[in-house]
A protein has these predicted regions:
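A short beta-loop-beta micro-motif enriched in histidine and acidic residues
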Residues: 42, 75-87, 141-142, 148, ...
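Glycine-rich, charged/polar anion/phosphate-binding loops
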Residues: 74-77, 91-92, 140-142, 161-164
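Short, structured patches in soluble enzyme cores that scaffold and shape functional sites
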Residues: 62, 74-76, 92-96, 108
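Short edge-strand/loop segments of extracellular domains
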Residues: 66, 107-114, 174, 180-186
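Non-heme Fe(II)/2-oxoglutarate
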Residues: 121, 153-155, 159-253
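Short, conserved beta-strand element in jelly-roll/cupin
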Residues: 81-99, 147-150, 155, 180-185
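Non-heme Fe(II)-dependent double-stranded beta-helix
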Residues: 1-81, 119
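Double-stranded beta-helix
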Residues: 97-161
Length: 253
């Protein structure tokens, strides 16, 4: 899974890139091909049927060359509509996914589960992921990991628990795209955010608004490198995350 950090790409002995690529729809040289898929008429029609909304905004995308060993999670912890629960995502198979490649999975019915999170779990990703890992240990037999073929798309709700199975054979790639869509009538945020995120820039493609990648994720500089490293470090340590949140509240007064 993308770490939101600036990293050098690591290539496996089989020639696959280990890291996922974040916001591939806003990548130079790659964006046009990806946007043709993610904003296609077929996708827009499917989104309308699933949500009942006429228009949707593309908020985030990722490309996977290899199984990135994504842990069990719910999207609404990281990005969602406000009010929560209306964002949805799609997993696009770019090749036939072999069962030993580490298939994508969902936990059917998990969108109805409302986990009570303590303060550490609300602000620190590591605590939240640990909670879901323990939950999945008791529900591993309930997961659904379909044998997706090239061109297949699996959509799920922002509350649905999902992730990827372990890779059994590293000789197999798992080329795929993931995209997150927000009905355009809703504001953008995440589950434990009190106010929507308003400083968002969009561009238009095929009648769909697409969120532009944040500059600190799009343009490399020492400043942006340090900024993302510090943020990710705090995000994995509850005490630091609490201190940071307290300082932000004091500054906002």
């Amino acid at each position: 899974q993308s770490s939101n950090r600036w990293k050098f790409n690591r290539i496996t002995s089989k020639g696959y890139c280990q890291q996922s690529f974040l916001d591939i729809h806003d990548y130079p040289e790659h964006s046009e091909l990806n946007l043709r898929i993610l904003c296609s008429e077929q996708v827009r029609t499917a989104l309308q049927e699933l949500t009942g909304a006429d228009q949707h905004n593309l908020m985030q995308s990722m490309f996977f060359d290899l199984n990135a060993a994504t842990p069990a999670h719910q999207d609404w912890y990281y990005l969602d509509s406000m009010p929560n629960g209306y964002l949805l995502a799609g997993w696009f198979a770019l090749e036939d996914i072999h069962e030993e490649a580490g298939r994508f999975y969902v936990l059917p019915g998990s969108h109805l589960i409302d986990f009570e999170l303590n303060e550490d779990e609300k602000i620190a990703n590591s605590s939240y992921v640990s909670k879901l890992k323990a939950f999945m240990a008791d529900h591993s037999e309930d997961i659904y990991a379909p044998a997706l073929k090239k061109g297949d798309v699996l959509f799920w709700n922002s509350r649905t628990i999902h992730g990827s199975l372990e890779t059994v054979n590293p000789a197999y790639s798992r080329k795929s795209l993931t995209a997150h869509y927000l009905p355009s009538s809703y504001q953008f945020g995440k589950r434990h955010q009190s106010k929507p995120k308003l400083d968002i820039e969009y561009f238009q493609y095929a009648g769909m608004k697409c969120r532009m990648a944040p500059l600190d994720h799009k343009v490399y500089s020492l400043k942006n490198y340090i900024k993302t490293e510090v943020f990710q470090f705090m995000w994995e340590h509850p005490k630091l995350a609490k201190a940071y949140s307290s300082i932000k509240r004091l500054i906002a007064r």
